[in-house]
A protein has these predicted regions:
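Hydrophobic alpha-helical bundle signature of multipass membrane enzymes
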Residues: 2-192
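Interfacial helix-loop-helix junctions of multi-pass membrane proteins
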Residues: 184-207
Length: 207
């Protein structure tokens, strides 16, 4: 290929920063929408900030800072949440001799899971590490098997928020504690380098 053709190919394949999503070619998540009938899921959340926006740049810098020097306690939190956010709640409940409502939680999550994936695929937000290099920002991602879907909203935080709501109905005295645990879950995903803070905020709104 001649030099002029190479240059032309680069120009032809140039993608606007704001058009970069998690998937190069957006796909629709296949879901039985009858399970969420009556809810206009497209109106649950606003669009995430554009990749070129000052807010996104600010969030990327925040994620970058948090991923540079993680403490052992932070690494442990990341590992626990990455495996199962409910472990945070199990320990809290065990110390107080309280039970986790497993059947109720999973029955509700079977519905919430549809929302989560439909929203993720609909917005197709790129993960922070996909956009950071375009702003000359370094994010040290701790790679696992739990961040291979679009970023917005955070599935882990949807999960932990549901747990907080479910447990608050049973044990209202500990409501603040339950939602604080969900905050820790969201922090863990930022510390891991796989989510924007606004991904977590969106999960709280959608749950």
């Amino acid at each position: 290929m001649s030099l002029i053709n190479k240059v032309d190919a680069i120009i032809s394949n140039n993608i606007d920063l704001d058009d970069i999503g998690y998937f190069k070619n957006p796909i629709e998540y296949e879901s039985d929408l009858n399970t969420i009938k009556g809810v206009d899921w497209k109106k649950l959340l606003n669009n995430p900030s554009k990749n070129s926006s000052s807010k996104t740049i600010s969030e990327l810098k925040q994620v970058s800072k948090l991923t540079q020097n993680r403490s052992n306690a932070e690494l442990n939190l990341i590992h626990v949440v990455d495996q199962d956010p409910l472990e945070l709640y199990y320990q809290f409940l065990l110390e107080r001799d309280l039970k986790f409502p497993t059947d109720v939680f999973h029955r509700n999550y079977n519905i919430l899971e549809h929302y989560t994936y439909v929203l993720k695929y609909y917005f197709n937000r790129a993960r922070p590490a996909q956009i950071a290099p375009h702003h000359d920002i370094e994010i040290k991602v701790l790679a696992t098997d739990t961040h291979h879907t679009p970023s917005y909203p955070s599935g882990h935080v949807m999960y932990s928020e549901l747990a907080a709501h479910t447990l608050s109905d049973l044990y209202p005295h500990y409501t603040k504690d339950f939602f604080r645990l969900s905050e820790y879950c969201g922090l863990a995903r930022i510390l891991q380098g796989v989510h924007y803070p606004s991904d977590n905020d969106a999960s709280k709104l959608a749950c």
